[in-house]
């Protein structure tokens, strides 16, 4: 089966369910790996479900970006193994964007593993009822991002100062120390738009957190 729009073509193999994508000119963009959709029965807390794995075939020199914020110092996520689960200093976003002009949003809320190697790229989710993802095709990177915003919702821009210079450390011991750092920045005429208090500024009793006093 072949489905066409003004931007892309999608082909579905009815014998094995494999899906491939191409742009309007017929240039291949992405294809599911042969036998790349796998369902493994699992049970959590008495609930029966499936661990779902979906594999794709990428070009050898194709760069992909995204997947959140991870502490491995990489922007291009080729040949990486990532746990897509929220953690301290780790932000998981199961979305990637390719230099070939497409984005892929893996639609699953359970802990997920992303892997890429010379053979295939794959998402594996611990619990799912199906292999669910969105393929976004655009002429430019901005257009692909617009399609993602159409899916997730439009977000207002932050205040201008939030895009400025920030100072942070682990951690300031007192309000006096924090304000002293700001004062020093001003004395040196070094730009500073925000400073991060970080943890423990709320004291030992969270129920009585003081919003106007550094109470640790």
Language model features by range: what are they?
Residues 156-216:
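Aromatic-lined carbohydrate-binding/catalytic grooves of carbohydrate-active enzymes
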Residues 2-160, 169-171, 175-176, 182-187:
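Catalytic and substrate-binding clefts that recognize carbohydrates or anionic sugar/phosphate headgroups
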């Amino acid at each position: 089966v072949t489905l066409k729009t003004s931007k892309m073509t999608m082909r579905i193999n009815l014998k094995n369910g494999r899906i491939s994508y191409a742009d309007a000119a017929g240039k291949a963009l992405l294809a599911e790996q042969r036998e790349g959709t796998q369902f493994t029965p699992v049970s959590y807390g008495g609930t029966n479900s499936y661990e779902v794995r979906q594999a794709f075939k990428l070009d050898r020199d194709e760069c992909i970006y995204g997947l959140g914020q991870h502490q491995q110092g990489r922007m291009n996520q080729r040949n990486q193994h990532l746990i897509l689960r929220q953690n301290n200093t780790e932000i998981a976003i199961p979305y990637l964007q390719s230099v070939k002009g497409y984005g892929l949003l893996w639609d699953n809320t359970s802990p997920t593993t992303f892997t890429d190697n010379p053979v295939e790229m794959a998402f594996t989710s611990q619990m799912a009822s199906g292999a669910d993802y969105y393929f976004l095709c655009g002429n430019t990177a901005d257009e692909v991002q617009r399609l993602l915003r159409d899916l997730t919702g439009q977000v207002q821009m932050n205040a201008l100062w939030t895009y400025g210079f920030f100072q942070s450390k682990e951690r300031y011991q007192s309000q006096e120390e924090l304000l002293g750092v700001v004062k020093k920045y001003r004395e040196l005429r070094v730009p500073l738009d925000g400073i991060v208090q970080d943890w423990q500024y709320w004291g030992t009793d969270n129920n009585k957190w003081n919003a106007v006093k550094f109470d640790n």
